Amino acid sequence: MATSGIQTKVPGIVSGFIGAIGRTPLIRLNTLSNETGCNILAKAEFQNPGGSVKDRAAYYVVRDAEKKGKLSRGGTIVEGTAGNTGIGLAHIARARGYKCVIYMPNTQSQAKIDTLKFLGAEVHPVPVAPFSNPLNYNHQARRHAESTPNASWTDQFDNVANLLSHYETTGPEIWDQTKGTVDGFTCSTGTGGTFAGVTKYLKEKSDGRVASFVADPPGSVLYSHIKTKGKHPDNKGSSFTEGIGQGRITGNVQPVYDLIDDAMKIPDEKSINMFFRLLDQEGLFLGGSSCLNVVAAVEMAKILGPGKTVVTILCDSGHKYATRLFSRSFLESKKLFDVIEPQYKKYIVLP
């Protein structure tokens, strides 16, 4: 049963930035829960100290590098990231005495790039290139680390320390917060660490009872890969969402691939309307990937049926995307303005 009102029971004193990571609330989305007859619960990962779910993985991949002797004090953390992992890494770099170098696609919001620079990171926005291309931002990050003394490429996409962060923290938190009543889990994947770690934990803890569905944006290969068992992967299309979707099966997804029960492709039209609906009806200002995840949770609830408890992830807030998602010209450029429901157009206040 969800508690109401402002809560006064809080964790005790924690040690620094890293001590503040995790233990995020699980929010019941009341209007959607009432509409579906299910409990739709969303993990408020935007409450992590760096502002996103990626703080968990950022800490674990740095700790992994330290344990393996790849990184010592004064060294350099190097990563390829769409933004949020980089922000988490930059915070941790400041806290632990490292330099931080980030390579990222030049399609990401300027707010993400600026935030990384504010945190002292060296940022290299590079043209978008597929993973098979040596100019892909991840490969450029790897080469930078290889050519820099005392530098470690943390390899968030294939380093299973990412998966482990969610297997050891996010998954157990969800299980404890729902008192083991969770019936379904769904979220999108970028690296796949959140989806994989939570799926692995909930499957093991429930003896396979908890269903796990991948939520995929247009332009990502996972939906078609799962639906055709890898025979006809298709990544046609594109999405306004940032940091999710994938053109391959990453090293974090591979270990749980056979545990995936189903996949859903979520069109941008539904995600953008959910962005405004959550603001309008729930008072939640979230990023595009979070809104896609909530659409997926609603779809999963309809599939599982009334009375079920479905959990998803609220990856980050909407602040880094505001200049785009409240902009008529941006929405028109993505062919989204005309599909937004009339009652939500009052929020589009930027030219």
Curated annotation (Swiss-Prot):
UniProt key word rRNA processing: no
Leading EC class: transferase
Residues with the N6-(pyridoxal phosphate)lysine modification: K54
Metabolic or biological pathway: Amino-acid biosynthesis; L-cysteine biosynthesis; L-cysteine from L-serine: step 2/2
Compartment list: Mitochondrion
Function of the protein: Catalyzes the conversion of O-succinyl-L-serine into cysteine, the last step in the cysteine biosynthesis pathway. Can also use O-acetyl-L-serine.
The protein, known as: Cysteine synthase 1
Native source species: Schizosaccharomyces pombe (strain 972 / ATCC 24843) (Fission yeast)
